[in-house]
Amino acid sequence: VGSEMCIRDRVKAIAPTFGGINLEDIKAPECFEIERRLKEELDIPVMHDDQHGTAIISSAGLVNALQVAGKKIEDVKIVVNGAGASAVSCTKLYVSLGARLENIVMLDSKGVISKTRTDLNEQKRYFATDRTDIHTLEEAIKGADVFLGLSKGNVLSQDMVRSMAPMPIVFALANPTPEISYEDAMAARPDVLMATGRSDYPNQINNVIGFPYIFRGALDTQAKAINEEMKIAAVHAIANLAKQPVPDVVNAAYHVNNLSFGAEYFIPKPVDPRLITEVSCAVAK
């Protein structure tokens, strides 16, 4: 509690000199209360990037990966490995976009988060499943359409990927070592649609694609907060940008001839100069 108050007091002390504040590297569950209180007490936008930046970019990736796979978000089964700030916020935004709570299974270090457990905080209770037939990641992932990993490296095996539904979506976002390597996932099955947090593989989920331009849109309109509608607008702006022809400067930066929307490119690159106008304008509206 003392450290939470210290962070809040320091942020409030500097707030009058800034138009917005981006919070970074505050662990769960403290981050939820710190952000909530600051949003209540300040009249400028406050956003915890580890939560909402990751959520927005991964949601844009999910929207597009589902299109490539020919699936609808309200129908897919989603397994989330990790229950920290990023995982919780990503999953909440997936729900805002149409994912159904009953189709989501979340796991923490103790296994499946179920309603039978008595050790859950408020954030975890929201995602607790009624299912009693699954306890481990290996059991939960069978037949799943989507895997979101925000946990630790090398916890997702090739056999687990093979047990997923056709054209599985695998977002292995642990850094620097993902839950499964790009090479191992592709070797397990060629139809996997994969994203990581790394720049040396296709479809990097990188917060820098979002937060600078989200704040630009909020500042341009003198918004007092970044609300759910603004986040969803950013999701769709980023997702739509990946479907447009890619500028030569982006192709050149990645030493490719012609990036185009599909399995290996469904998230815009961080160097794309169109992000500032597309995302900030969408947020401002």
Model-derived segments and spans:
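Long hydrophobic segments that form regular secondary structure
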Residues: 133-190, 222
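Adenosine-phosphate binding glycine-rich loop
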Residues: 49-50, 69, 172-284
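Phosphate/diphosphate ligand-binding glycine-rich loop within oxidoreductases
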Residues: 10-53
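Short, ordered loop/turn segments at secondary-structure junctions
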Residues: 3, 25-28, 49-52, 109-111, ...
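General beta-strand structural signal in soluble alpha/beta enzymes
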Residues: 22-25, 46-49, 80, 106, ...
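Glycine-rich phosphate/diphosphate-binding loop of Rossmann-like nucleotide-binding domains
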Residues: 48, 52, 56-152
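Short acidic, glycine/serine/threonine-rich loops at helix termini
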Residues: 8-10, 31-37, 57-63, 89-99, ...
